[in-house]
Amino acid sequence: MLAIAISRFRNAKTVRFTQGATLARDERVYYCVMDTFEIITKEDVARAVYEAIPRIACELPGDVLAALEEARKAEGPTRGAFVLDQLIENARIAACDQVPICQDTGTVWVCLEAGPDMLVPGDVFAFVNDAVARAYDEARLRKSVVRDALFDRANTGDNTPAFTDMHFVDRPGARVHVMLKGGGSDNASRVVMLAPGAGREGVVNEIMDCVRVKAANACPPLVVGIGVGSTFDKVAHLAKSALLRPVGERSSDPRAAAFEQEMLDAINATGMGPGALGGRTLALDVHVETAPCHIAALPLAINMGCSAMRRATVELAPASKGRGGR
């Protein structure tokens, strides 16, 4: 293998390493030792975020709009049908006039996924924040971030910082997920550390309690993301990541897929309906992500996604490739 000087990577100051990479250092520069590698630049990540924000603020994803239209066909003469008519017409006007779907243009969640042998510059977070600030200013989107949750609730004035995660995954390539998350849907969400003895029944009961108590405040019909497992800090990420999956797409795990359908049927059987004004469709879909956990724990997170489920995924092409050999 060949030691590749980091200074060659568009002057990147730091690099995050995939599994199998090794690190060496001399007095001048860090080196990354890998068989092969691909580079994605911070400029490409920032561009993806900058271009996605105004688009998803004004245009519902096709799968979400199609699900609203299907729900309207199935609704019948209910007050929920009126809600769906308004949501569909609102989406049409927003896309046509390029104005926000909702006055709450949300906080920005960015999730960068990098596959095996991908090199990512460490200061990408600063570039993402700059892209968010420019996008919100130029598109005249509402700024909704305060400086400190407890001690200084002054608006930052540019909707930064974005809430950015970086993950290395087994899937090849790199992609950026962008989501605009309104306050109402997150406020209706929940994280619970159940005892293992609660089991499947306890998980179901907690989900249904959250739905009955909180769903009306989350602007339904909803997409419900459910995370089960991992740890206290990671289970919420599982639930939010579940919202990235298109409406109608079931989990690749047949057990999780069956549970998704079971929970979707149970949630819609409440009769709360669109806008919680009565009807057939309280949820457009339920997505479940599971993970291992400690033997003494059963972490559960429920993340509500509102009817304005604003998200996009952008595949990134590597800026260059390299191969080593020592």
Where are the model-predicted features located?
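Extreme N-terminal basic, low-complexity initiation segments
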Residues: 1-11
